[in-house]
């Protein structure tokens, strides 16, 4: 994946790609204006999620921003229907599992508090997603 990203951005030599553990990022405090995560949080067990969110807060000078799945009964039902209709093996197995492993807005808020976010805010968004950010 990194090789593809590098190839696609070859005309932008100022862009760097780094593979790293999200719970121990190799960047200094406040290295970025924002630290953005998309569709990652649901892959983390709660303890790892707290470590991950703590690292995002640490490296973000202004705000960490997390977009992820939002666990609801309707989201799980939709994922099951998609899995039943799909021919793709990954979709069949991953869609319902990802929804089951995702967090509710309240759970995401609590994880962010535990990670030391000063003023976490969670907003439900379309298609059973949520947006979590530190409004501090």
Where are the language model's segments positioned?
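Conserved SAM-binding loop
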Residues: 5-6
């Amino acid at each position: 994946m990194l090789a593809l990203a590098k190839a696609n951005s070859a005309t932008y030599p100022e862009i760097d790609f780094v593979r790293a553990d999200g719970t121990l990022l190799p960047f200094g405090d406040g290295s970025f204006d924002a630290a953005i995560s998309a569709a990652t949080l649901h892959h983390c067990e709660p303890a790892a999620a707290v470590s991950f969110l703590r690292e995002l807060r640490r490296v973000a000078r202004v705000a960490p921003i997390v977009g992820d799945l939002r666990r609801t009964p309707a989201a799980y039902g939709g994922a099951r229907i998609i899995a039943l209709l799909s021919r793709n093996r990954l979709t069949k197995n991953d869609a319902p599992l990802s929804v089951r492993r995702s967090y509710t807005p309240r759970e995401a808020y609590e994880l962010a508090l535990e990670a030391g976010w000063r003023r976490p805010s969670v907003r439900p968004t379309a298609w059973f997603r949520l947006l979590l950010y530190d409004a501090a």
